[in-house]
Every structure is written in C-alpha cells, then in structure tokens.
A protein has these predicted regions:
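Hydrophobic transmembrane architecture of multi-pass small-molecule transporters
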Residues: 9-18, 23-30, 34, 79, ...
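Glycine/proline-centered helix-kink
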Residues: 150, 171, 176, 180-188, ...
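C-terminal membrane-cytosol helix-exit motif in multi-pass small-molecule transporters
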Residues: 205-223, 239-251, 269-283, 520-527
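Cytoplasmic helix-loop-helix junction between adjacent transmembrane helices
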Residues: 145-174
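Hydrophobic alpha-helical segments of secondary membrane carriers
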Residues: 171-175, 305, 429-433
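Membrane-embedded alpha-helical segments of multi-pass transporters/permeases
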Residues: 123-127, 211-216, 275-279, 378-381, ...
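Central mid-sequence intracellular linker of multi-pass
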Residues: 206-245, 262, 289-295, 454-480, ...
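Transmembrane core module of solute transporters
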Residues: 39-103, 108-111, 116, 122, ...
Length: 540
C-alpha cells in the first residue's frame, strides 16, 4: 500500500521522502519496532494473510449454503438469509470502532483476541441447534471480526521495510479480493460433499494457527493500550444507524423496498440516527469514530473511489455465478471454475504493482484498474445464452489484471499524508465504507437484475402468440412431442426466462462498465504527492 504520498501503517519512513517522516511528537511509533526479517517475516505474513482470508471468506461462504441450512433448521430460505444479514450488520457496526478499540487494548492484543473469538464463534455456529441460536452466534462472529481486516493491514505493513511496503500491501489486497470469489465455490463444495456446519468448522484450525503465530511474533511489538473514554452516545447512535441501514440494504429486495412499511421504518431510523451521529461525533472531544478524517481531500476522494469501485466489483462478483447457475445450467462447481481463475493474473502482477506504487502516480495505476474493469464488463455485456465456457472464462482471467492495480494504489491515496497514530482509525473507517458499498452494490444490482428481467420478459412475451410464425412452429413441435398445451407454454416460458435474465444481466454489466469509466473523474480529483511516503510509519 505504498504510494506517492503514502506510508504504510507502522512501517519505517520511506527512503523517497525522509523529510516527511513524522517525529515521535507527531504520533509516530516509538523507535524499536524494526521491520521483521527471515522466517519471522514469512510466518508473520502467512498468519496475517490467513486471518484476513478467513474473515473475508466468511462474508460469502454461507451464501450458497442457505438452502441446506434452512432445510436442516426447518425454516424458509427467506428466514435463512438472516444467517448472512446478521453477520453483515454486526461486522458493519464493529469495523469503524477499530480506532477506539486499538487505543483501548493495543493492536496485537486486539487482533489476537479477535481471531480467537472468531474461532470460538465459528465453532458455536457449527454447533447451533436452531436458527435463533445460529443467528446469535453469527452476530457474535461479525462483531469480533470487525477489527481483523484493518489491523491485519496495519500489522502487515509494519512488518516490512518501507521499500517493500507496496509488496506487502499487494499480498494483503489479494486475500481481500480473491476470498469473496472463493467463498461460494468452497461453501458449495463443503455443503454438497460434507455438511454445512463445516463451512464454519474450517475456520478453527486456520484461526488457531493465525492467532498463535501472530501472538508469538508480534506481542513484543505492541505499543500497548491507553486509557481512553468510551463515547457511549456515539456508540448507541452508530449501532442504530449502521444496524438499520444494513438490515434495510440486505432485506430491501426481499421486502420490495419502499413498498414495505418495515423498510420505510428502517430508512427513517437510519437517516435520523445518522444525522444525530454526525452532529455528535463532529463536536465530541473523544469521538468513537474519527469523522474528521473526511476533511482530508485524499482520504475522502480515495475512500469514495475505492468504495464505489468495490461496490461495482462485488455486485458483479455475486451476480455472475447466480446467472450461470440459475439460467445457464452451471453447477456450483462449474460456476466456481468459471470465476476462480480471476486470481491468476492478479497474483502474477500484484508484486510488480506493489514494488512500483511508490514510484508511479497511484492515480495512473488505479486508472489501469478502472479501465480494465470497465473493459471486462463491456466484454460481458455481449454475453448471450449461447456463450460457452471459454467465452465466459476469458474476461474472468483478464479481470485479474485489473484486480492487481485496484486496492494498492487506491489505498495509497486514502492514507496519503496521515500520521501513524491515525492509521487504525483511518483503516477502520475506510474499510467500513468499502464493506457497506459492497453490500449496497450487491443489493442494488440483484434488484436491478430482477426488474430488468421482468421488463425483458414482458417484451419477449408479446411476440409469443399464434400470429408469430416462429412461436407457432415451436409450440407445434412441442405438441408433436407429446406436450400438453400447458406444458408447451411452460417450456416456452422457461426459454423466455433464460433470455430475459440473460439480457438483464448484460444490462447490468454494461451499466457497471460505464460507471467504472465515470469513476475516473473522481479518482483524478485526488492530489497525492509523488515521492511522499509509502509505508506506515510516515505520513500516511
């Protein structure tokens, strides 16, 4: 995550801008936390990457298992979706609290405790005897997961010398981007071949290894806790605002959005509590969330660019396998095989991006990502029902190149000019906005897909009548094959559904491509300084 005008949190000052490294008085870490070397560096990187991958994986691994979970628990699939919603709501609430929690408990203590509690919550999820208990344990899992991603970023960057901070950020970014793609594939395979509780049990060995390695390597590098007051009013308002907003986002499509009194109520609660939250946090002496970060040009523009782009990316990550499985006849495994190769070019190119992000304007690198994503989505906008596996695979592979240029330069812009003491708060806040944007993108895109499919279905249905020679011939052929009139019409309707949902998904792909190109305007409004820091111990 190094970049012009960036310093990775906790890393040493960049050689490119020694004059800009903050002094101890400015909040820089106390001397003594030199970069890790040798086996400690390797094991530390593995531990932090495992924890991050495990965390992000859990945001999507349960998605394809909802039918199995609902069936076992004796509830409807709609009720089963609370397994996803409960985690998302709790996680969204706890992520922006990372800054305060870090001051109160210390980085390493908080991270290690979060991982261990995540393991315990995962174990309890697998043991849950009924849906209310499973939802409760998912809430617990989401709450303790919040600090893991921001702190893994901070600790990882503090482990590397400034010259290699970009490479460290590249590895971190890959876990965040690849895990949501791997989640549905892994979750589907486990559910089909073992049992759904194992989508939670697999976290236990991974988490124990990650926590053990992290504590053994990093415990002596923790600056320790500070006595800071708890902003109770801010916390209550945050819970109300984020909780209502996240439930509204997750349940909006299911409840028909603002035609539902429940959604309207949630929207009112979210807006009112958000306004009170803003007023309180901007005037409180010890705010639980440092909203003053949004006064910084690079932070706000970088966060918006990253979050909107992530919302577009994540919404399409969810939509593509849904279309493949529901309307193209793909199994969960084959849909996974069609989307998994996205990591190939990303893994190949990310080290180069990390190495050069401090030498090249991060806006130029991020432009490659936005143009790449836009080009891939434009290719997908030409899909049809005859698209074969290779036609679907090629854009997926190319998307990996865009992913390599995505996180690293954008986070370089986000953290540009920040001192190390503000890094945990900045990382938590930017990750909160990004995660929320991912949820919004998923909800809006699935809703748009359904509405466009209904429109296309209505238009296509107009041509299915006895006055249309092609439709008449198809119905006659079905009748000659022994279909009753009702069966023939049902068969034709399935074909219309396939065409309608395919046209609708290409509409979404096209819109996403346009939005990625439009985001370039927002990106280039940022002003990172080339040659400023690239690590975390300097002015991030």
């Amino acid at each position: 995550m190094s970049s012009p005008s960036i310093t990775a949190p906790g890393a040493a000052q960049p050689p490119s801008a020694p004059a800009q490294a903050p002094s101890a008085a400015s909040g820089a870490p106390k001397p003594g936390f030199a970069p890790l070397t040798g086996s400690q560096l390797v094991l530390g990187t593995v531990a932090l990457s495992l924890a991050t991958f495990m965390n992000v994986l859990d945001t999507s691994i349960a998605n394809v298992s909802i039918p199995a979970i609902s069936g076992d628990m004796g509830v409807s699939p709609a009720q089963g979706t609370w397994v996803i919603t409960s985690f998302a709501v709790a996680n969204a609430i706890s992520v922006p609290l990372t800054g305060w929690l870090t001051q109160r408990f210390g980085q390493v203590r908080l991270f290690t405790a979060s991982v261990l509690l995540f393991v315990i919550a995962s174990w309890l999820c697998g043991l849950a005897p009924n849906m209310p208990m499973l939802i409760f344990f998912r809430v617990l899992q989401g709450l303790v997961a919040g600090p893991m991603i921001p702190l893994s970023q901070t600790l990882l960057l503090a482990s590397y010398p400034a010259a290699k901070a970009g490479t460290a950020m590249a590895m971190w970014a890959m876990t965040v981007l690849v895990a949501p793609v791997a989640g549905p594939l892994l979750g589907g395979w486990i559910t089909d071949n073992i049992a759904w509780p194992w989508i939670f049990y697999i976290n236990i060995p991974v988490g124990l290894v990650a926590a053990g390695l992290t504590w053994s390597i990093y415990r002596s590098r923790d600056p320790g806790p500070k006595r800071v007051p708890l902003d109770r009013v801010g916390l209550v308002l945050l819970v109300l605002f984020v909780g209502a907003m996240q439930i509204m986002i997750d349940k909006g499509k299911e409840l028909d959005w603002f035609n539902s009194g429940q959604i309207v109520t949630l929207a009112v609660v979210a807006v009112v509590s958000f306004l009170f939250f803003l007023a309180w946090e901007l005037t409180d002496k010890q705010p639980i969330v440092d909203l003053r970060l949004f006064a910084r040009r690079n932070f706000v523009l970088g966060t918006l660019s990253l979050s909107i782009a992530y919302g577009l990316f994540f919404g399409n990550v969810v939509l593509l396998p849904l279309w493949l499985q529901q309307y193209m006849g793909y199994t969960a495994t084959w849909a996974g095989l069609a989307t998994a190769p996205v990591g190939i070019l990303a893994i190949v190119l990310s080290p180069w991006v990390g190495k050069n992000v401090g030498k090249i304007d991060p806006r130029k690198l991020a432009t490659v990502a936005f143009v790449g994503f836009g080009g891939v989505l434009w290719m997908r906008s030409h899909f049809n029902t005859q698209a074969d596996f290779m036609t679907i695979l090629i854009p997926t592979v190319l998307q990996g190149a865009a992913m390599a240029f995505f996180f690293i330069p954008l986070q370089a812009i986000v953290f540009s000019g920040l001192t190390p003491d503000r890094m945990p708060a900045a990382s938590g806040l930017s990750n909160f906005v990004r995660i929320t944007a991912g949820a919004v993108g998923t909800s809006l895109f699935t809703t748009l897909w359904e509405s466009r499919a209904a429109l296309h279905h209505a238009q296509l249905s107009e041509s299915v009548n006895r006055g249309n020679a092609t439709a008449t011939q198809a119905l006659n052929q079905l009748a000659a094959s022994g279909y009753t009139p009702e069966q023939a019409l049902a068969s034709v309707n399935r074909l219309l559904d396939q065409q309608a949902y395919t046209l609708a998904v290409t509409d979404v792909f096209y819109l996403s491509a346009v939005l990625f190109f439009a985001l370039l305007v927002l990106l280039w409004a940022a002003r990172p300084k080339l040659g400023a820091a690239a690590g975390g111990g300097g002015a991030h």
